[in-house]
Regions:
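Short acidic/histidine-rich active-site segments
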Residues: 41, 186-200
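Histidine/acidic-residue-rich catalytic or RNA/ligand-binding cores of hydrolases
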Residues: 15-18, 48, 140-148, 167-180, ...
């Protein structure tokens, strides 16, 4: 089991990240990745870039060196009703992949029912592609209720490698969420959530957990170039050249 793309990374325009776009892409190439998504925090996050960062994402070349670059965002799920960062449709136009995640600075934890309702609202949000780091134990929610509805709304679930080391008690949550994704055949991505170039593509802990439960590789959208290409083709995006698919 492997990944060929890292779909959750942050560059230094996010203040608590440390590497430039060039450094992140070079790290992806050094790791042998075919693609990387740059997914900085939304503009209303106290540590996020200005909205113009996102409106200018289309300045980033599709391919830098050997690596395909996906233009993304990590939305903050906002309290209390499960909104996302306020950003204009014009600024969102270049965005090709969007995660939505709980962060304590934008959504102080409450209880499972409130968190579940917020996630349910995100299911209906057309701008969001994926749920980010759902295993955070500060945000308990009804796992089965949300996961069982993801396919109906075209949402994938991220298994976040960083959660396994920095978010207390997230391992069991991540495993339960992964088992439910397997049960309901919900596609997932496996990502580093890297905030520095040295961690790009490092998802060993997440892959080990998935192998432990026998998670099917065909449900991991970033486990092959073909699967990733098919995922984005389904959303009208031509991601890879023919030579990349050989």
């Amino acid at each position: 089991m492997q990944i060929i793309a890292d779909l959750h990374t942050h560059t230094s325009v996010t203040d608590h990240a440390f590497s430039t776009l060039t450094e992140m892409v070079q790290a992806a190439e050094d790791r042998g990745l075919a693609a990387i998504a740059i997914t900085n925090h939304g503009p209303t996050n106290p540590d996020g870039p200005h909205e113009w960062h996102f409106s200018n994402l289309d300045l980033i070349p599709r391919k830098i060196g050997k690596v395909t670059v996906i233009r993304g965002i990590e939305f903050d799920i906002t309290a209390p009703a499960g909104g996302i960062n306020v950003i204009s449709n014009k600024s969102l136009k270049p965005v090709e992949f969007a995660l939505a995640s709980f962060h304590e600075c934008m959504f102080p934890p409450v209880d499972s029912s409130v968190h579940t309702a917020a996630l349910e609202a995100i299911l209906y949000n057309p701008y969001v592609n994926a749920f980010g780091h759902l295993g955070n134990s500060n945000f308990p929610f009804d796992h089965e209720y949300i996961i069982s509805r993801c396919n109906d709304h075209g949402k994938i679930v991220e298994i976040n490698n960083a959660s396994l080391s920095i978010r207390k008690d997230s391992h069991d949550n991540c495993m339960d969420i992964a088992r439910l994704c397997m049960k309901y055949e919900v596609p997932i991505s496996v990502d580093s959530d890297s905030h520095i170039c040295y961690r790009v593509g490092h998802v060993e802990g997440a892959l080990e957990m998935l192998e432990e439960i026998g998670f099917p590789e065909e449900l991991i959208i970033n486990s092959s170039v073909e699967r990733l290409n098919n995922y984005f083709k389904g959303r009208g995006l031509h991601l890879f050249d023919e030579e990349d698919l050989l």
